[in-house]
Amino acid sequence: MSHAPPLGALLRQYAAGSALTCDPVEQGLLNRGYRLRTTRGRYFLKHHFDPETADPLAIARQHRATQRLADLGVPVAPPLTGTDGRTVAVIGGHAYALHPWIDGRHRHGGQLTTQQCARLGALLGVVHASLERVMPTQGRTPARPSDVTGATDGSAGAGGSARADAGGSAAAEGVDPARGADAADTFALIDRLLAQVRRHRPYDAFDELARHRLLERRALLERHADRRPPQGGSVGWVHGDFHPFNLLYRDGEPAAIVDWDRLGVHPRAEEAVRAAVIFFVRPVGALDLAKVRAYARAYRRTASAGPAELAAAVHRVWWERLNDFWMLRWHYERGDTRADPQFPAASALAVWWTREYDTVCEAFAG
């Protein structure tokens, strides 16, 4: 097993018995996870591998947050505490955490009823409202968004690290996190990507679609370049990566929200919009607006968020999507094709959303 964790030392630190089996779960982009069965039970062992989120102090902070959320009844899976009183084990310079194993499955919005979509929106609203209660209020300034988004892969264990197209990547260099991408930077990025597409050999169907979408997006940006959003609105503590692969369902109900590595201070309503866009996008690149409406109304109610806050968030996330090419950058600049299956729907969504802008705003804020 590659990257095998130091099970002996870890299990001693958590007094979790002796290992019987240890199997890697489907490997996430940012961290590594293992389904661990010992003489004392079943666990999810998480190796915090991503340098951006592997600081033990930051991990301990998100652990404390999930413990407090659990006390409020939010479905989370807080880590176990070691014999030293800590939840983070640092062994050989690597940070680990041990969580209870949560049986469950991931569900996309297409697998949810309208009523379940409303419960999903209410759940995220409860998360945001609860974080306001359990996290410090001093020094609440928006964190700089990561320039990395992830490929869609998931794990069924508590605390798993799975990432999907959160649409939050900085599509162009020099992004002002308070205002979003500058169209001039995006035009330069489009030109660079087009040159890479032309040079790619053998030229295939993905290259043809990429070229088509890049030219299409450039035309859209030329028409809408003056719609860059103003300074962002009110901020609060958010999960930071709320999407189908970080939510486990059991018997039709949410069992656990996992992967809190991106816990931070950001505009709350933008997380609600990004999550809905991921949950409710159809393969053709359109949103299921009936489900969006049910979700958004429930979110606004439980998060005490007004229509104007949601409408502003819709505009900012739309602009973010219009300027976002992280999947193509992975494909052509990194040679990483894991996100390729997402590209057809994600790239079509920006076009559809621009055409149906008012209808989408109404679904979230009406």
Which functions belong to the PLM regions below?
Residues 29-37, 44-45, 79, 224-270:
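Active-site acidic catalytic loop and adjacent metal/ATP-binding pocket
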Residues 110-211, 235:
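A cross-family kinase active-site recognition segment
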Residues 39-141, 170:
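ATP-binding pocket architecture of kinase catalytic cores
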Residues 1-20:
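Juxta-kinase regulatory segment immediately upstream of eukaryotic protein kinase catalytic domains
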Residues 154, 165, 192, 196-200, ...:
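ATP/Mg2+ or Mg2+-diphosphate-binding catalytic cores
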Residues 196, 213-224:
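Membrane-embedded hairpin module used as a gating/binding unit in multi-pass transport
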Residues 23-27:
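Protein kinase glycine-rich loop
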Residues 269-304, 317-336:
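Active-site activation/catalytic loop segments of kinase-like enzymes and analogous catalytic loops
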